Design a protein with these regions (language model features):
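Flexible, compositionally biased loop and terminal segments
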Residues: 1-204
């Protein structure tokens, strides 16, 4: 049911010409769950990823997976990469966060930035002086797309649980009481209406 809703959601986003959608299908913390919970879910994800290229072709949407894919089973990673390679370009973008943790993303970005600076010959205070928010942002998993404007959290939870910690600094949040499989078109429309009625200040 949740995967069917995922396909529907892509259609809803397409109707409103939303250029970037990021969906969190599996957190890094989820990976600590027992195999009898994870294995069936992995199978569902593989089935979804097999369908994704067709869906994304219909909506002219590029696919990119973000997260610690090295922690995931080989067959799941293979299905993800096949989907990504099948539709790498498009006027819209679908990010799928899998094995994802917001803190880990920031750590990975910091490591990548420092490694890049060292390779360029920087060290000591000179290296430190090169580290700033713009430089770090350029090394986030989805650095090539804008930060999100709206984050929709389902399941009645009022927390981010580590989702897009860096990118969501100025995003607007909408918390929805229903679980994801029960998320309806009307819930989506209400979230957009709520967002449209807000006055965004971007921290000012």
């Amino acid at each position: 049911m949740g995967m069917a809703r995922f396909a529907e959601f892509l259609g809803w986003a397409n109707q409103f010409d939303i250029p970037v959608v990021t969906a969190w299908v599996l957190s890094k913390e989820n990976l600590s769950r027992p195999p009898n919970e994870l294995d069936p879910y992995f199978e569902v994800l593989i089935e979804l990823f097999d369908r994704l290229p067709g869906l994304c072709e219909d909506y002219d949407t590029a696919i990119k997976f973000i997260g610690s894919l090295d922690l995931l089973p080989d067959d799941l990673v293979s299905a993800a990469k096949s989907a990504e390679e099948a539709h790498p370009g498009g006027s819209r973008r679908l990010n799928i966060a899998m094995g994802y943790g917001g803190r880990q993303e920031i750590v990975d970005a910091a490591k990548d930035l420092v490694a890049e600076l060292v390779e360029k010959g920087f060290s000591g205070d000179e290296l430190v002086s090169q580290i700033n928010s713009d430089a770090l942002a350029a090394h986030m998993y989805s650095a090539e797309v804008p930060d999100p404007d709206l984050l929709i959290r389902t399941s009645g939870e009022s927390r981010l649980s580590g989702f897009l910690l860096w990118q969501s600094a100025y995003a607007e949040f909408v918390f929805v009481d229903v679980n994801w499989p029960a998320f309806r078109h009307v819930d989506f429309l209400r979230a957009l209406r709520d967002f449209a009625g807000r006055s965004r200040r971007f921290g000012q």
